[in-house]
């Protein structure tokens, strides 16, 4: 029996010259009939902690730790999925003929979505609006995904409108921060962020620095090697 899922995409440090070593593209996925209940549960978490801001990795600090800890616990106890693609930008070779950074970016979005979309189901895909190029970006993504008949909707959404986009931002931030810690790019003095990273590692039973099996659905990571 066919099911409908909503996929909420986000991206982090994806610009070519933003000073960050990794590009991350990700999504949070949830079955359409479960959206209302999930929204209500997340709203209750925010109210319990008197938290009124968007969920963002940049908003994680000691005073907000408990609400983020509850959010992560809730995710792993409920029927949602997270997937991320991670690329070391230093490995991207723009010297290849007819190949640009933007070409690579869209190919990675294709990999993010195509590998986990089941032809037996239908999907509504929402992408976080990032910049003034959003319209052109959407048109190109639609062109790339046009042969995938399972995708019913592909449109933009603003992050403040979707707690599921915000959830993807938190997980990406944790993955990125963990990688930069290992690389020595950050000192790791933010105890709240370190504690959340350890919580995610414990729940997912992975290190956050290597690929998981494609069949692993709850928390799926794909580190793309271009060497």
Regions found by a protein language model. Give the residues of each.
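Phosphate-ester processing/binding pockets and catalytic centers
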Residues: 1-227
